[in-house]
Amino acid sequence: GLPVCGETCVGGTCNTPGCTCSWPVCTRD
């Protein structure tokens, strides 16, 4: 739930391991 992945996922996917897409940013926990 924290936007600490430093990645956006406007396309719907995250490349960073352990991160999920909470549009439009990738989040972890």
Swiss-Prot record:
This is a cyclic peptide. GO terms for biological process: defense response. The keyword Disulfide bond applies. Keywords: Disulfide bond, Knottin, Plant defense. Coiled coil: none annotated. Pfam families: Cyclotide. Disulfide bonds join C5-C19, C9-C21, C14-C26. There is a cross-link at G1-D29 (Cyclopeptide (Gly-Asp)). Belongs to the cyclotide family. Moebius subfamily. Probably participates in a plant defense mechanism. The presence of a 'disulfide through disulfide knot' structurally defines this protein as a knottin. This is Kalata-B4. It comes from Oldenlandia affinis. The lineage of its organism: Eukaryota, Viridiplantae, Streptophyta, Embryophyta, Tracheophyta.
